């Protein structure tokens, strides 16, 4: 074995400012990316227009940027089908599917605890007027 083959895998520490895992956390922590992961995980491959309809309020620019970031990071695949008009489908990769449970739980947690968060916000705002 060569010396380079014996080297341990690089260690990552997201608490360190220079760690590349921070950029990955920026991507998966983005609200549109997290919702895209859940939407694609629940419904399977979807066309751009279906994703746009599923995620109310997302602009074309943000949807496009989010999908490109996800594709670059290996979370989704983009498949073009030659037709009139061209059909483009997005699907989670196995790496993207590995995030599905976590993102689904986070979405469900937010939906379940929204009344408590709203009450806390109202109390905070009342105390800080």
PLM region descriptions:
Residues 74:
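Glycine-centered, phosphate/nucleic-acid-interacting loop/turn motifs that mediate DNA/RNA or nucleotide
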Residues 119-129:
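Acidic/histidine-enriched, glycine/proline-rich intrinsically disordered or flexible terminal extensions
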Residues 15-62, 82-83, 89:
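N-terminal helix-turn-helix DNA-binding core of bacterial DNA-binding proteins
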Residues 78:
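Short beta-strand "wing" residues that participate in macromolecule-binding interfaces
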Residues 63, 67-70:
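Basic amphipathic alpha-helical segments that dock to polyanions
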Residues 1-28, 128-129:
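N-terminal leader segment of winged-helix/HTH proteins
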Residues 21, 25, 103-110, 114-121:
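Hydrophobic alpha-helical core bundles mediating ligand binding, dimerization, or RNAP-core interactions
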Residues 82-106:
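Basic, amphipathic "hinge/linker" alpha-helix immediately C-terminal to the N-terminal HTH DNA-binding motif
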């Amino acid at each position: 074995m060569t010396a380079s083959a014996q080297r341990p895998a690089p260690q990552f520490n997201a608490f360190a400012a220079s760690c590349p895992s921070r950029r990955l956390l920026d991507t998966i922590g983005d609200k549109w990316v997290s919702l895209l992961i859940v939407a694609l995980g629940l419904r399977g491959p979807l066309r751009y227009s279906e994703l746009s309809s599923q995620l109310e309020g997302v602009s074309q620019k943000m949807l496009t940027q989010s999908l490109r970031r996800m594709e670059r990071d290996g979370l989704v695949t983009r498949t073009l089908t030659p037709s009139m008009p061209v059909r483009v489908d997005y699907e989670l990769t196995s790496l993207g599917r590995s995030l599905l449970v976590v993102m689904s739980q986070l979405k469900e947690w937010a939906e379940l605890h929204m009344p408590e968060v709203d009450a806390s916000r109202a109390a905070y705002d009342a105390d800080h007027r």
